Amino acid sequence: MTKKNDPGISCSMEEFLGTDEVESVTSNTSWALKERLSFKPPLCDVFRQPFHLLEDTGEFKFHVHPEARKHLPDIIENVVQKIAGNENPEETAKQQYTKQRNIGIVFSGGPAPGGHNVIAGLYDAMIRANPDNRLFGFLMGPDGILENNYIEITADTVDSYRNLGGFGMIKTGRTKIDSPSKMKKAKTTCLTLELDALVIVGGDDSNTNAAFLAQELYQDGVQVIGVPKTIDGDIQVRDVNGNSLCAVSFGFHTAARAFAHNVNNLCSDCSSDVKYWHICKVMGRVASHLALEVGLQVHPNITLIGEELADFIDQERIEKAKKEGTTDYTAYGMTLRQVSRLICDGIVRRAAVGKNYGVIVIPEGLLEFINEIQVFIIKLNTIIADYNNTHDTDFHSQFPTLEDKLEYLRQMARMSRENRMFTVWNTRDDDLFNVLPDFFQEGLLTERDSHGNFQFSQMETDRVVMGLVEDYLKMLADRGVYKNGITVESYRQTMEEGGLDPDLYGPALFRDYKPDNGFLLVKESIVSVKTLKQNLVKEEVIDPDEDIPKPVETIYKQSVPKFKTQYHFYGYDGRGNDPTWFDCTYTYNLGNNVFSLIANGATGQMAAIRNLEKEFKDWEPIGLPIGSLMHLEERMGKLTLVMERALVDIQSPAFSVFAAKRDRWLAATPGEDCYRRPGPIRYAGESEDARPITLILNDLGSDVRPGDGS
């Protein structure tokens, strides 16, 4: 190349743009990508053996739902299976293990970091067993199965995606194979391709699909294996005795780390310019696992956990009801108003020590844990459905504006006062509803989906909560409760530079004036320049006809807080992130596990790794019976057999540690904040997290009895 910056040498721009060096610098393949593609995740010891067998174990038991037994008769007797290594099995077992197979794989639902390594692990394992094995990737999710749309996955394909995030290799989709016609199409595709096995990588719904497909294809000899995927972390499996068999789904650790890194950047920002509260909503509609992990990773000033709010009991209201000889069912579960008060308390306490800034983490599904919101949704669903069933026009056409709808609800509240039998919408409902911000009222009253259900995903959870917070903070400011703390040094310097005696004015200005206090709070009665002067006159530090001294007015204005917010949503960026070492390794071993299950004839099983909460050397690949994990749940207005999702256990060691430390992390004291820097995601190196903090803490506290140390 002729370098343009070499002395005495020049070249045209056209020549410069065509050089190899320019192409190298601007290539799609960065050095970081090259290193990722070449990273080789370690294998569990069992997978280092040339052959693998399955060992049925009666060690773990489940409560099997009668409906699961009814609808999944051919796979419901499955048990937990351990993968065992074998160097030289019997010839029959060896032939079974190494026979040529056609295997299909599909991604279902949203992306989760590590999916490509499931494919890589499966591909490597099956090629080791028999180089003639073939792997077909169905494109665009389950639609690829229904439409027989696939690619054959080769070594070059796999090598192009090792350790990378996203589901770009074969894409994904949310279609469910949940009807007889779809089942028939899926079966036709599997039989046309002469598949020996189908692997479904997905969340609770997708693994439910895997169970029903396993049942449907059982007589055709097509095995179906599920793989636990969801960044929400709500696929967790325990047996009836509480033994952890699958501590978390893949993708969770990477998403949490990605969110944590971004949230920590905001911690650095807010503590630098000290004027914003950053409101961070993180994915997790059904469970708050991501919010809890981010809280433990970063130590934000306030982190809300939906499951804890749902578990709240208002003892004052219970006692009041007891005295009245009644039961107050609304005393169970925190109300929106109480949630807003909780946040306001933290904001006010921080402002009092000069920290009118901070970071709040809110789980996406927070509103689903608020009892009053669920009650509102049930009642409004009933009101709207009843209206549509009894009138010639529908509710939303008859009442097009928010005010029209609110007036109709007011009429119903008046009816409840006149007729005690009318309980669908009473005065208390109306009063609580009118406290909500207009946009949230509008959201709760929007048109239902085709099944008559409320569309929760359309709600801006963070703005709903913070709208109430801002209203209450204004009220607290008007009452003189919400104030910025003033440092003694700043106060004395301002006064002395203005030629005033700080000790003369201090008792008139501040609540508990002591020259050795770290921070001073202006009296609650001083809420305006007018009340400031009244206090100064009352304390006889100025005469009624005197103006307020400029330094005193400056101090007052500094005490008046300005509540400024910035909103952030963390979801899609985390689920598309390149995976951590934990997820790279977890998923690569899951892929190997999938082949071991297939090679030994398993079907209706979910590949899993036991002991994820422990060090890598203790990981134990197993197969879990999906049918035994099913329960009935309301979906789309009817009870449906689905795989159960796990919520945050507020009795767990991880949550207990979080609860014990959150007041320290609020940092409502003079001095530095307690923010933790998790650092960027890596796939190797001593600085990389070995596993999620929630898993580490739960393992550390596994022998601690509830209540110990309290």
Segments from the language model and where they lie:
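Short glycine-rich or small-residue beta-strand-to-loop segments that form or flank ligand, phosphate
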Residues: N102-A112, G168-G173, D196-G202, W277-V282, ...
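Helix-enriched interaction subdomains in cytosolic or periplasmic regions
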Residues: D20-K82, I318-G325
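Glycine-rich oxoanion-binding loops at beta->alpha junctions
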Residues: Q49-Q96, I145-D196, N241-N243, V248-N264
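Short glycine/serine/threonine-rich phosphate/pyrophosphate-binding segments
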Residues: A112-L122, I145-L146, S179-K184, G203-F212, ...
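N-terminal phosphate-binding or glycine-rich loops at protein starts, especially the Walker A/P-loop
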Residues: T2-P41, A93-L146
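Accessory alpha-helical/coil subdomains and C-terminal extensions
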Residues: I200-G202, T208-F212, E216-L217, G221-I225, ...
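Phosphate-binding loop/pocket of nucleotide- and phosphate-handling active sites
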Residues: D545-E546, K550-V552, Y556-V560, L612-S710
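N-terminal glycine-rich phosphate/adenylate-binding segment common to multiple enzyme folds
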Residues: K3, S12, E21, T175-D220
